[in-house]
Structures are given as structure tokens and as C-alpha cells.
Amino acid sequence: MKIKIIKLTESAQVPRYSHADDAGLDLFAIEAQKILPGASALIPTGIAIELPQGTEAQVRPRSGLALKHSITVLNSPGTIDAGYRGEIGVILINHGQETFQVVEGMKIAQMVIAPIMRAEIEEVTELSATQRGEGGFGSTGYA
């Protein structure tokens, strides 16, 4: 599968896989930005993409940023639809207690390309019974 990419700025980096078996392509910041504790920020990547029909791109957090700095993608996963042609931006949130400094060229998120399925919606008056029923939100225990 081919993904077409346009660099919107000279400093933009084309997303790339760090390892042969990686699911996600690294996304890079094109500018420095501070994120205060508890705050969020839209970080530009300087790229736009063209996805094949029937696919989406999911923007996901980087585990190292989450573990070491409490930085994650706010709307995780963020969805990029095949018809979108604008700049990809990553909404990061700082769950930590210290200001986080995004630097130009930093890996800020990963982008996973996935197939989509379109559902046919059928409105009904009742749903079929299951063993689980309406149990949710911890109904199966904590362990």
C-alpha cells in the first residue's frame, strides 16, 4: 500500500518506521512548544497525506513519552479519514507535574494505517439477549 505525503514546510520530516516490524510510523514536530502541566497543545507536523480509499490513519501516543513524561495524545486514537487533505496535527496533553518542552524534530506520536469497515445501521425496538447483558464498567471484577 502506498501513502502519498506532502511536506508543507522545509523542516517537516516524512513519517517513517523505526524498525521493520513496527505498526506505527513516527510523526515529528516541526516547531518547539512548551506544554504546561495539565495543559494541551496542538503540535503541527508540517505534512499532509493522501490515504487509499477504505483506510484510515490512527494517531496514537508514544509509550516512552507517556512513561517518562506523562505526555499522551489527548484524543487517542485520533482518526485521519481518507478524504482529509489538511496538515496533520497532534493534540498532546501533559498529565505530569512539570512543563514539557517539545523540540523541533522530536518524535511526538505514531501513525498506524488501518482498514475501515462501514456499518449498515438498523434501528430496532430491542436487542438480542446475551449472558453479559448490560454489565459493564467493572462488572466483571477488578483483577
Curated annotation (Swiss-Prot):
One of its GO terms (biological process) is dUMP biosynthetic process. It comes from the Bacteria. It holds the Pfam family dUTPase. GO terms for molecular function: dUTP diphosphatase activity; magnesium ion binding. It is an enzyme of class 3 (hydrolase). Substrate binds at residues 62-64, 75, 79-81. Pathway: Pyrimidine metabolism; dUMP biosynthesis; dUMP from dCTP (dUTP route): step 2/2. CDD domains: trimeric_dUTPase. Its cofactor is Mg(2+). Keywords: Hydrolase, Magnesium, Metal-binding, Nucleotide metabolism. Its EC number is 3.6.1.23. It catalyses: dUTP + H2O = dUMP + diphosphate + H(+). SUPFAM superfamilies: dUTPase-like. NCBIfam families: dut, PRK00601.1. This enzyme is involved in nucleotide metabolism: it produces dUMP, the immediate precursor of thymidine nucleotides and it decreases the intracellular concentration of dUTP so that uracil cannot be incorporated into DNA. Belongs to the dUTPase family. PANTHER family: DEOXYURIDINE 5'-TRIPHOSPHATE NUCLEOTIDOHYDROLASE. This is Deoxyuridine 5'-triphosphate nucleotidohydrolase. It comes from Acaryochloris marina (strain MBIC 11017). The gene is dut.
